[in-house]
Amino acid sequence: MEILKRYIISFVTLVTLSGCMKDFEPETDQPSVLCLNAMITAGEPFELSVTHTWRYSKPVADPTVGDADVALYVNDEFVERLVYDESRPEDGSAPKSSYKSAYAPASGDRLKIVAESERYGAATAEVTVPAPPTVRDVKAEPAVTSTWFSDHGDGSYAIDLSFRLSIIIDIADVDKSANYFVFDWANGSDEEETGFRFSLGSLNYDAEPVFSEHISAFESIMGSDAWGFSVFSDRRFAGKSYPLKAVYNNCSFYLWTGYDPAEDYFHPTVEVSVDNISKSYYDWLIYDWHIDNGFIGSLGDIGFADAIISCSNVSTGAGVVAARARTARSVDLHDFIMDTLNNLQNNQQ
């Protein structure tokens, strides 16, 4: 290990001392092409962004292509032509434009989008809408780390709880094909008007191994980690079930009004979801991670490695048309909070 450290230090020193950059403008006349981007959610109509590419050294004010003809095919059958819509926000910000579908794709649909422009040519993208993940069970394992109690003397009091929350999501991989997922969450309640405030702590990405499955041993040694990245595949549990564990540190619950344990008026909740995503989206997310956080991406930025080629499922090589299907669950912490509050109240008597 000591020898490895010396090699790493020597390599980093070499990169630092010898790296250089030089502006380079290739004398090529690369024509602009169509760029397609969309996130298609099962069961919902979708919006498609149609823009054109441009030279990095010659930026354009608005790359939107508003006169394209966009056709949608589902399972090899023509369904509709998407309608161009330009909305102008009331706050005066730049207009938002997209091509909108009336059709709501279902899981299993094979979608083909064909866009044509007289000026920028044609672009085609294909994607299959995945099925929602099978989540068999979701359970919470909270653990109190500290408490604070203040008796106001008039029958009311204030309580502040700090706790760690582990949420275990049992995902069943029932599909024989490869599957790709994104885990997400939201604080489902912050009800100050009812006399309490619940704050969900930060997710400990290192507590769940699948969040770092894309990181090589070498990248780990060089300091890469999975912070901020909750994308994973079923490579570790293909055809099986997997207990995904989300650990949140430094959660808090604060109650500052009088309360009656018999009242059932507060339900601090956490909304968790698992998306089954298309491979086109998974590939792009992995590419984006390597560019921003990977060691090879960092070397490429300074000319010591080949540039990482962007991922695209559009025929022109520009843009990503992705699809997803979501399974969401709500985790109610009411019973845990009530039991803890009652224990605190009894201990004060």
Predicted feature locations:
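Extreme N-terminus of proteins, especially the signal/transit-peptide cleavage junction
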Residues: 2-3, 29
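Sec-dependent signal peptide recognition
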Residues: 4-10
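N-terminal hydrophobic targeting signals that begin at the initiator methionine
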Residues: 1-2, 21
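A sequence/structural signal for flexible, mid-protein segments enriched
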Residues: 21-349
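Short, surface-exposed polybasic-aromatic patches that bind anionic ligands, especially phosphate groups
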Residues: 14
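C-terminal motif of bacterial Sec signal peptides marking the signal peptidase cleavage site
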Residues: 17-19
